[in-house]
UniProtKB/Swiss-Prot annotation:
Chain intervals for the UniProt region annotation (Disordered): 74-95
Keyword set includes Hydrolase: no
Naturally occurring in which organism (per UniProt): Salinibacter ruber (strain DSM 13855 / M31)
Origin organism lineage: Bacteria, Pseudomonadati, Rhodothermota, Rhodothermia, Rhodothermales
Protein name according to UniProt: Aspartyl/glutamyl-tRNA(Asn/Gln) amidotransferase subunit C
Pfam family, one: GatC
InterPro entries: Asp/Glu-ADT_sf_sub_c, GatC
Length: 95
């Protein structure tokens, strides 16, 4: 598949990016090479390869949940610079 500078311009516009003409030309060439490689992958015979969600055989490495003693809300809020009885209070950052 060949990527044109118009294709690059269109995608750049969607992503709100601005490229020079040299950058557009370089990206069109590089993307064409990448898509050419992907097309080569389509030629591979994968009939005997089982579907997988991960390249490596990964198992669950998470620990099991254990109930632990926890601090109460008052202790958690105590070091906060500003809090009410239930919440941390922070300055407004978005108007």
């Amino acid at each position: 598949m060949s990527v044109t500078r118009d294709d690059v311009r269109h995608v750049a516009q969607l992503a709100r990016l601005d490229f020079s003409e040299e950058e557009e030309a370089r990206m069109a060439e590089e993307l064409s090479e990448i898509l050419g490689y992907v097309e080569k992958l389509d030629e591979l015979d994968t009939a005997g390869v089982p579907p997988m969600s991960h390249v490596l055989d990964v198992t669950n490495v998470f620990r099991s949940d254990e109930i632990e003693e926890r601090i109460d809300r008052g202790q958690a809020l105590e070091p906060a610079p500003d809090a009410d009885n239930e919440h941390f209070l922070v300055p407004q950052v978005v108007e």
